[in-house]
Swiss-Prot record:
PANTHER family in the record: 4-DIPHOSPHOCYTIDYL-2-C-METHYL-D-ERYTHRITOL KINASE, CHLOROPLASTIC
SUPFAM superfamilies: GHMP Kinase, C-terminal domain, Ribosomal protein S5 domain 2-like
The enzyme's E.C. designation: 2.7.1.148
Keywords: ATP-binding, Isoprene biosynthesis, Kinase, Nucleotide-binding, Transferase
Protein name: 4-diphosphocytidyl-2-C-methyl-D-erythritol kinase
GO MF annotations in UniProt: 4-(cytidine 5'-diphospho)-2-C-methyl-D-erythritol kinase activity; ATP binding
Organism: Nocardioides sp. (strain ATCC BAA-499 / JS614)
Source domain of life: Bacteria
Record has Ribosomal protein as a keyword: no
Chain positions recorded as ATP binding sites: P94, V95, A96, G97, G98, M99, A100, G101, G102, S103, A104
Pfam families found in the cross-reference section: GHMP_kinases_C, GHMP_kinases_N
Family (UniProt): Belongs to the GHMP kinase family. IspE subfamily.
């Protein structure tokens, strides 16, 4: 199974609720960077991982600590079956980068194990299980472009008439999502209870208007991420000086994404940023499909 990375085209964050969670209004877009999860029958349970050269060997937790273990446990408990199988994760989505790579793995694992175990779980039940795993997991199942509300886990597909090109620059060190939210709370103690709506962004993508999209991109967590990691602000400035229509921190960071006008524009910007000393620079288009079958092993 293959599942995509996501970028947040809009991320409005409200003040924390009594339960500690922040209400969100976000627009997700699935982009063409993928993790692959392969599931094979086996008498016991095991999870392995393959990483590209630019990822640290310890970037993905194993030994029962991976989100795919929790996905398997939830699916098995839902149907009253035993957790068995051999899963292998081939990573390509930046880890701890604000692009929901772990959520993509969980979504792919749910679909792969549902097929492996012959369960035929309904789409509604898969989405409910996904929401229990994390706010980004339901979207990784759906893909495309979608509006997320609540904690981001209530996902509604939206009209998107564009094909958008992005340059993605991951960081060699992660940035803790909880710490970014805590820093947001410190920086903005008077944040409104209701998040900034996404009307301008939704209008831009419905019209397929690249310049309107560039103007409408919004991330309330960007200031907190840049305050914690000032080099992210310098990277965004560098990308925009090199011709990006707009750059921003993806989600809670530290990955930065840059909107480009075409595939050629994206390749040119990627080459420029790579030449400026960034060791990993990726180009990707969106929107793309959510978790889907690639082949049976």
């Amino acid at each position: 199974m293959r599942a995509p990375a996501k970028v947040n085209l809009h991320l409005g964050v409200g003040a924390p609720r009594e339960d500690g969670f922040h209400p969100l209004v976000t627009v997700y877009q699935a982009v063409g960077l993928y993790d692959d999860v392969t599931a094979r029958a086996a008498p016991d349970w095991s999870v392995g991982v393959g990483l590209p050269d630019w990822m640290d060997d310890d970037a993905v937790p194993l030994n029962g600590a991976n989100i795919v273990d929790r996905a398997a446990d939830l699916l098995a408990a839902h149907h009253g079956v035993e957790r068995t199988g051999e899963l292998h994760i081939a990573k390509a989505i930046p880890v701890a980068g604000g692009m929901a790579g772990g959520s993509a793995d969980a979504a792919a694992a749910l679909v792969a194990l549902d097929r492996l175990w012959g369960l035929d779980t309904s789409d509604d039940d898969l989405l409910a299980l996904a929401a229990r795993l994390g706010s980004d997991v339901p979207f990784a199942l759906l893909g495309g472009t979608a509006l997320g509300t609540g904690r981001g886990e209530v996902v509604t597909p939206v009209q998107d008439r564009g094909t958008w090109w992005w340059v993605v620059v991951p960081s060699d060190t992660g940035l803790s999502t909880p710490e970014v939210y805590r820093h947001f709370d410190r920086m903005f103690p008077d944040a409104p209870s209701q998040p900034v709506p996404a009307d301008a962004l939704l209008g831009a993508i419905a019209a397929g208007d690249t310049w309107a999209l560039a103007d409408a991109l919004h991330n309330d967590l960007e200031a907190a991420a840049i305050d914690l990691r000032p080099e992210l602000g310098r990277l965004i400035e560098r990308g925009e000086e090199a011709g990006a229509l707009r750059g921003l921190v993806s989600g809670s960071g530290p990955t930065c994404v840059f909107l480009c006008g075409s595939a050629d524009h994206a390749r040119s910007l990627a080459a420029d940023l790579s030449g400026a000393g960034h060791p990993v620079v990726l180009a990707a288009n969106g929107p793309v499909a959510g978790a889907h079958l690639v082949s049976y092993a």
